[in-house]
Swiss-Prot record:
Keywords on record: ATP-binding, Biotin biosynthesis, Ligase, Magnesium, Nucleotide-binding
EC number(s) on file: 6.2.1.14
Protein known as: 6-carboxyhexanoate--CoA ligase
Protein family per UniProt: Belongs to the BioW family.
Residue runs in coiled coils: none
Purpose: Catalyzes the transformation of pimelate into pimeloyl-CoA with concomitant hydrolysis of ATP to AMP.
Organism: Fibrobacter succinogenes (strain ATCC 19169 / S85)
Cofactor(s) annotated in UniProt: Mg(2+)
Top EC class of this enzyme: ligase
InterPro entries for this protein: BioW (IPR005499)
A GO BP annotation: biotin biosynthetic process
């Protein structure tokens, strides 16, 4: 069976003159069978046209054929939930989960990644706010490894296995668990830290092969449009090029099991 990769990106013009730039409004992607292509594309456009961030000035929909033999099927990460009272507590919980993973890798070399990341966490997260993709942060050196610091690194070509949804509503959980599962399986990946940029969604997560997918129910204030994603990577385990190649080009379907 052949599949089709469908990608939608929507943006709007912001500012005037030299300060004019494109601001991301909405994005979505799916991998579906031929019979679902038309309906899913229509749903993606509806989603872009009805976003809380406003009306888009530009919508791009890309359709690409994908051979079944090129697809890797992964079982979704196990899911746990962490309830918190404040977003500050949520960020502390997230770091508390990441720190042991960093410490384990410190023992393998002269890396003070955990300490550096704790000191820089807030600054790193703020740096991701205007980025279109994720930050790729090397825990071995403390350096950012994205080829384009504005664009960042995007994990693409992924969907849930057997997914038949065609409506335009965003399913935050499904989209996040699919992305987190693919990212966790990338060469050299240690963990992922994510806060949604949706002003109406305050849940974030930390994910890795060791932790699974940990939903932290409050990571920012309601109405805050800022959000970002950091991929914590270990350059002693794989090259940045190998990791980015997997994230951006490998086709993946995720068998989503359970929800918390």
């Amino acid at each position: 069976m052949d599949y089709y990769s469908l990608k939608m990106r929507a943006s709007q013009h912001v500012g005037e003159g030299e300060n004019s730039h494109e601001q991301h409004i909405s994005g979505a992607e799916r991998i579906v069978g031929r019979d679902s292509v038309e309906a899913v594309c229509a749903a993606m456009v509806r989603r872009a046209m009805n976003h809380s961030k406003g009306d888009p000035d530009f919508i791009n929909v890309k359709i690409e054929k994908v051979h079944e033999s090129d697809i890797q099927v992964l079982k979704s990460l196990p899911v746990t939930r962490v309830d918190v009272e404040t977003w500050q507590e949520g960020l502390e919980k997230a770091f508390g989960l990441i720190t042991p993973l960093m410490a384990l890798r410190q023992a393998q070399g002269p890396c003070d990644g955990a300490k550096k990341f704790k000191e820089k966490l807030q600054d790193l997260l703020r740096e991701t706010f205007p980025m279109r993709g994720a930050m790729l942060y090397d825990i071995a050196t403390g350096n950012r490894l994205e080829p384009d610091k504005d664009r960042g690194v995007r994990a693409t070509y992924m969907d849930a296995l057997h997914s038949s949804e065609v409506d335009g509503c965003k399913n935050h959980f499904n989209e996040a668990i699919v992305l987190a599962t693919k990212v966790a399986n990338a060469p050299g990946m240690v963990a992922e830290f994510c806060v949604s940029d949706d002003p109406n969604y305050v849940t974030g997560y930390v994910a890795s092969k060791e932790l699974g997918y940990v939903r932290i129910m409050k990571m920012k204030e309601m109405g805050d449009e800022n959000g970002g994603r950091i991929f914590l990577f270990d350059s002693r385990k794989a090259s940045a090029e190998e990791c980015i190649e997997y994230l951006q080009k490998k086709k993946v379907l995720v068998d989503v099991v359970g929800r918390t």
